[in-house]
Amino acid sequence: MRPIPVKNRIGKNNIDNAKGLKGNKLIRHYHNLLKEKSRLIASSAPIEKIKNVESELENIGIDAYQRASRSGQAEGKGGDSSKILIKWIRTTPCFSYCARLKEPKDLLEIGSVSVDNKCSTCGLFRVSRIDLHSVHPLIKQQDFLERTPEEGLFTGISCSLVLNFAPPELRAKMLLHCTGLLMPPNKEQPPWLFLVLPSPCITNSRYMDEKTLHSIMIQFGFICRQKSISKKIAYYLYSYECFPMKEIDWKKKIVNDGATRNNFFIPCIL
């Protein structure tokens, strides 16, 4: 079952359809509804349309959303991705300064669903956690793109299973926004971005493969230092070593054709 398009979400039939969504599809649908509600309010849309979206959010229920979010960290679905992050931070030479220094480094966790994962308990980081819909008092409810540098800069950003949920037109903006929230680029002790995607986004996309991903990331100033791909999840750790290009442009083109391919891509015209 595909996620329900925004333009088709309003109305009783679509509310009934949403009941069948589970896991990642439910999370994506819930996030898109929150964005749709914000868009309607900002555009002074008729109150009836806003109430319809609110009704569907209530129909899904925050409890169901929270259960779906937490299930993403179950061992059978990739587990706590920050375990891999901490291992890489400790063993990758250019990032080992994070483990050597006694003062914890600042880490921003986007789409946080847990306050007791490995990055929160390892002692290496002061973790700031945000999510579109907080599931815990220590997780700030905030849209990542609305966070400002004035709120603080970070040594590292964890973006685990977040970019794939974002609308395609916002993915490049999110990567660019990461560069604005990281400490300035530094080749000796570089800030870093931990990017986690469902592996089919890389291994079974019509428009994306690992070479394409790394080529796109280079335009933002990111160099891949570690990677690991399992059947379900792809993990990447990038060092932030130079400022983004003034003009970032990467148009969609087919790299793996086939009827069974998905359409994941990061369109870049900035």
UniProtKB/Swiss-Prot annotation:
One of its GO terms (molecular function) is rRNA (adenine) methyltransferase activity. GO terms for cellular component: nucleolus; nucleus. Keywords: Methyltransferase, Nucleus, S-adenosyl-L-methionine, Transferase. The keyword Heme does not apply. S-adenosyl-L-methionine-dependent methyltransferase that specifically methylates the N(1) position of an adenine present in helix 65 in 25S rRNA. HAMAP family: BMT2 (MF_03044). This is 25S rRNA adenine-N(1) methyltransferase.
